[in-house]
């Protein structure tokens, strides 16, 4: 995909408007998880060092649009940036009618959702944002699937609209995994329901050489293979859909599973062959044989796309499947991309962050990209590159 990259532009003396993803958790006025800010720092530093007049903004939380609310202010982010960049960073509350900035200066523009018309991508607001800058930088992949004034509209009216390093890297990594993957390509889709991941499964079934399913999703496929799943979470109305997918793509179905009688952290895991699952059993994880089989598939993969754990990994007795998959991905020499909240939690839990080629920053945007949907912000950047 062809977009203008911020790193290819001369930014000296230019007014640069960066739409970042600084939507971080805040408690008692302090940022409690700084991952998104840290991810945005290289983009901000690059602009400052290039001698640009830098404005950065984001949404934070879900305020009532058009109304200021202190609990959703970006002030805690400004305080964090002051320390992280070791320079004075100001917060601008009223900025829509223009700002005066010096080269090498950074101003944070208050929460975009305090501006009426932001979510509806209103043209008037988009033009006001665009009038503030010479160059618009879209660097928030996490909101690229939303057509809003600060992610889409502004880019249609700014003199130049480009992709920031974070967004460019994300598009490159996902493109490498999805568009022309090195083969064999293995996709892992976990989660509780087939219904919430159906489009993802359908999209990946056309690309992947092997499609691995886990979690509650796997139970529907076990049922589709003709086995009893007891009281396990599964979707009877999607069994036929699962069968159709199994006809279209190689989907290895578990041969053994870890069961219990109740959804309880302290429940003992009982390993059973899938043909031995009883009516009162609940399947919470893959068994050791199935995990080993999947690990072998991953060992030979040249491309791996991972979205979702394969069991209730939060419970010690049912973490083995996800742990085994994690370790196999970490050991693989193939190119691996992982995304989704639960997936990131599993990566942290099993300490494999350094061994995954690319970890996506976008939840909903990651899924929509994998579904094959066009992301409005990316479509805008492509249009502006022509």
From Swiss-Prot:
Protein's gene: pgk
EC number(s) given by UniProt: 2.7.2.3
GO annotation terms (biological process): gluconeogenesis; glycolytic process
Assembly with partners or alone: Monomer.
Binding site for ATP: 197, 314, 340-343
Binding-site residues, substrate: 21-23, 36, 59-62, 113, 146
Keyword Membrane carried by entry: no
PROSITE patterns documented for this protein: PGLYCERATE_KINASE
Compartments in which it is found: Cytoplasm
Pfam families: PGK
Known catalytic reactions: (2R)-3-phosphoglycerate + ATP = (2R)-3-phospho-glyceroyl phosphate + ADP
Native species: Vibrio campbellii (strain ATCC BAA-1116)
One MF annotation (Gene Ontology) recorded for this entry: phosphoglycerate kinase activity
Enzyme class name: transferase
Protein's UniProt keywords contain Transcription: no
One CC-aspect GO term: cytosol
UniProt name for this protein: Phosphoglycerate kinase
Family: Belongs to the phosphoglycerate kinase family.
UniProt keywords, alphabetically: ATP-binding, Cytoplasm, Glycolysis, Kinase, Nucleotide-binding, Transferase
Pathway annotation: Carbohydrate degradation; glycolysis; pyruvate from D-glyceraldehyde 3-phosphate: step 2/5
């Amino acid at each position: 995909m062809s977009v203008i990259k911020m790193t290819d532009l001369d930014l000296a003396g230019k007014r640069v408007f960066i739409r970042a993803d600084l939507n971080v958790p805040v408690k008692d006025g302090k940022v409690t998880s700084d991952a998104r800010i840290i991810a945005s720092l290289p983009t901000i530093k690059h602009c400052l060092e290039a001698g640009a007049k830098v404005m950065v903004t984001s949404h934070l939380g879900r305020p009532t649009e058009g109304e200021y609310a202190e609990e959703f202010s970006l002030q805690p982010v400004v305080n964090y940036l002051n320390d992280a960049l070791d320079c004075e960073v100001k917060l601008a509350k009223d900025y829509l009618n223009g700002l005066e900035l010096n080269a090498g200066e950074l101003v944070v523009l208050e929460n975009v959702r305090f501006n009426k018309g932001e979510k509806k991508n209103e043209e008037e607001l988009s033009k006001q944002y665009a009038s503030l800058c010479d160059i618009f930088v879209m660097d928030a992949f996490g909101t690229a699937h939303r057509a809003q004034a600060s992610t889409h509209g502004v880019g249609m009216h700014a003199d130049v609209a480009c992709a920031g390093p974070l967004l460019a890297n994300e598009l490159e990594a996902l493109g490498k995994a999805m568009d022309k993957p090195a083969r064999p390509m293995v996709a892992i889709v976990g989660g509780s329901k087939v219904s919430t991941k159906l489009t993802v499964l359908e999209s990946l079934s056309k690309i992947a050489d092997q499609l691995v399913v886990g979690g509650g999703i796997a139970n529907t496929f076990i049922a589709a293979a003709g086995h009893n799943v007891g009281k396990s979470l599964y979707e009877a109305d999607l069994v036929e859909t699962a069968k159709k997918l199994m006809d279209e793509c190689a989907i290895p179905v578990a041969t053994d599973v870890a069961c219990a009688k109740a959804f309880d952290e302290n429940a003992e895991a009982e390993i059973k062959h899938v043909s031995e699952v009883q009516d009162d059993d609940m399947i919470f994880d893959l068994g050791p044989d199935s995990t080993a089989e999947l690990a072998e598939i991953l060992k030979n993969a040249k491309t791996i796309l991972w979205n979702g754990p394969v069991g209730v990994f939060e419970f010690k007795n049912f973490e083995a499947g996800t742990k085994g998959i994690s370790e196999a991905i970490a050991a693989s020499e193939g190119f691996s991309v992982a995304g989704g909240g639960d997936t990131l939690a599993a990566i942290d839990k099993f300490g494999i962050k350094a061994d995954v080629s690319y970890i996506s920053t976008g939840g909903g945007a990651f899924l929509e990209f994998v579904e094959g949907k066009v992301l409005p912000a990316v479509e805008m950047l492509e249009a502006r590159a022509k």
